């Protein structure tokens, strides 16, 4: 069943032995030469003597004081609030414009450390890997960033005597208009709070001058709102059939009367309101009444002029429909019936005009998401004593002319959130305020009443910005006292920076002597 194993009948011959094709050498000598004895012949290979002394310096050496050169990678640390620097150099400085010592030897006082230098071997071209970390506490409404002021054109004077609401025209006698600077308090607000403060500022301007010069409440010609005022507009009568505008916020809006305007030329408030220029680099940004063609706010239906006689209470006699001319307090809605096909108010809405094709508002402006950060741009870092000036700059230590070595977006962000039933929250808030008319001065007037908040709203938030800025050319001689400067788009130190740290890690980029 199994086969037995049999031994091989023949054994293969061994390989032929002969001289090796390669010479047998040990350290360049034949193997028969004793180690340490003089060779009978010259060695085939030259073996240099072993180096027993370490180098005293090199192209990557870093010298500091009288210590031995350091040839390992090191780091320089820049800190904005060192106690020794505060007492010595930064009494009148801030976190965006300060001087700091990069020599942290505890045996040296700040004055001595500032006179020391760190030498990078001048036979090499050095670069430093820069990493910055900045923390800010910037509000979205501030005078520094021009987000607390806007210019408005309002009626400042008119002839005494009211305007007949039944006249069907809007022509206040002897009306004079004037530009005002509307300023709101600095702070960090939500979008609906900014709109409330703007409207309250309009009322204050009216009480300050217009009221004393025969200007009526119905002549207040600038209103910031959030509603689509043409919702539920009847296509036949042109009237808003419920007799009231839909109280729901959608997007910030500007409502104007003839002769009134809003100027955003030197203000960032347009960005907070989501109203931007379609050509952002053009000069000036003014929204006038004439720009809002096609945006007339429809008049309200006077419910007392019609009689609902059907079961579902939806059918009315069109011939009997009349516009509502004034509110319960007698404040006119400035309804125009002369020269128009359908009754409409003299008020014009930017939001309605924007959605009218080929209107000046649509051609000049752009509806955007409200930027609660105020559209603040970039943040520039300058370290004139550490890095050589990049191409396009020249060496300068002046505050507004320092060469820029790093940049990043300002770490202030717009955060969008959804708040359901925001109008109910507003009503509850107004009910708990001691001054119930703080932001709702004219609750009976459908135009001038408080604007409803939006369910999709925004807030401003500051978050730390940690940025790896890359490798930049270093100077070969670094003084112990270094200047750090953080500026805005206009090259001004930013007062809202309250923590700044940076690290620089030097390394050799190339040789400055070998070509």
Swiss-Prot record:
It comes from the Viruses. Keywords: Capsid protein, Host nucleus, Host-virus interaction, Late protein, T=25 icosahedral capsid protein, Viral attachment to host cell, Viral penetration into host cytoplasm, Virion, Virus endocytosis by host, Virus entry into host cell. Residues 9-22 have a biased composition (Pro residues). The keyword Cell inner membrane does not apply. It is found in: Virion; Host nucleus. One of its GO terms (biological process) is endocytosis involved in viral entry into host cell. Induction: Expressed in the late phase of the viral replicative cycle. Major capsid protein that self-associates to form penton base pentamers, each in the shape of a pentagon, situated at the 12 vertices of the pseudo T=25 capsid. Involved in virus secondary attachment to host cell after initial attachment by the fiber protein, and in endocytosis of virions. As the virus enters the host cell, penton proteins are shed concomitant with virion acidification in the endosome. Belongs to the adenoviridae penton family. All late proteins expressed from the major late promoter are produced by alternative splicing and alternative polyadenylation of the same gene giving rise to non-overlapping ORFs. A leader sequence is present in the N-terminus of all these mRNAs and is recognized by the viral shutoff protein to provide expression although conventional translation via ribosome scanning from the cap has been shut off in the host cell. This is Penton protein. It comes from Fowl adenovirus A serotype 1 (strain CELO / Phelps). The gene is L2.
């Amino acid at each position: 069943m199994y086969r037995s194993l049999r031994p091989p009948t023949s054994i293969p011959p061994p390989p032929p032995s002969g001289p090796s094709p390669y010479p047998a050498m040990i350290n360049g000598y034949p193997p028969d030469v004793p180690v340490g004895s003089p060779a009978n012949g010259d060695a085939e290979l030259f073996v240099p003597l072993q180096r027993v002394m370490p180098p005293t310096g090199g192209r990557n050496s870093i010298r500091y004081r009288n210590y031995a050169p350091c040839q390992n990678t090191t780091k320089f640390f820049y800190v904005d609030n060192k106690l020794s620097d505060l007492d010595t150099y930064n009494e009148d400085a801030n976190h965006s414009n300060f001087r700091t010592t990069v020599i942290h030897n505890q045996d040296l006082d700040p004055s001595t450390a500032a006179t020391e230098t760190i030498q990078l071997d001048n036979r090499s071209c050095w670069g430093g890997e820069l990493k910055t970390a900045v923390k800010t506490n910037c509000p979205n409404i501030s005078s520094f960033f021009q987000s607390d002021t806007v210019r408005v054109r309002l009626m400042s004077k008119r002839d005494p005597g009211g305007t007949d609401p039944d006249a069907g025209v809007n022509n206040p006698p002897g009306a004079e208009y004037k530009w005002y600077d509307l300023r709101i308090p600095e702070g960090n607000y939500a979008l609906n709070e900014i709109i409330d403060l703007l409207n309250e500022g309009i009322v204050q301007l009216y009480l300050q001058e217009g009221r004393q010069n025969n200007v009526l409440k119905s002549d207040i010609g600038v209103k910031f709102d959030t509603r689509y005022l043409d919702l539920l507009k009847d296509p036949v009568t042109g009237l808003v059939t419920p007799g009231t505008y839909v109280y729901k916020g959608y997007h910030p809006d500007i409502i104007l009367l003839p002769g009134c305007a809003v100027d955003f030329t030197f203000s960032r408030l347009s960005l907070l309101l989501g109203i931007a220029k379609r050509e952002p680099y053009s000069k000036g940004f003014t929204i006038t009444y004439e720009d809002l063609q096609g945006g007339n706010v429809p008049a309200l239906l006077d419910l007392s002029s019609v009689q609902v006689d059907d079961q579902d209470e939806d059918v009315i006699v069109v011939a009997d429909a009349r516009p509502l001319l004034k509110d319960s307090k007698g404040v006119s809605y400035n309804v125009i019936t002369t020269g128009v096909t359908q009754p409409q108010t003299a008020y014009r809405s930017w939001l309605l005009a924007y959605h009218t094709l080929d209107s000046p508002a649509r051609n000049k402006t752009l509806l955007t998401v409200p930027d609660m950060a105020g559209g603040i741009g970039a943040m520039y870092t300058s370290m004139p004593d550490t890095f050589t000036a990049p191409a396009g700059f020249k060496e300068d230590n002046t505050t507004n002319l320092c060469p820029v070595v790093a940049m990043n977006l300002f770490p202030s962000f717009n955060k969008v959130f959804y708040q359901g039933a925001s109008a109910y929250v507003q009503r509850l808030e107004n009910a708990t305020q001691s001054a119930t008319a703080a932001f709702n001065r004219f609750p009976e007037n459908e135009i001038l009443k408080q604007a409803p908040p939006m369910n999709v709203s925004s807030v401003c938030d500051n978050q730390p910005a940690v940025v790896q800025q890359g490798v930049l050319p270093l100077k070969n001689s670094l003084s112990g006292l270094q200047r750090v400067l953080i500026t805005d788009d206009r090259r001004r130190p930013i007062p809202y920076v309250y923590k700044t740290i940076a690290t620089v890690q030097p390394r050799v980029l190339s040789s400055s002597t070998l070509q």
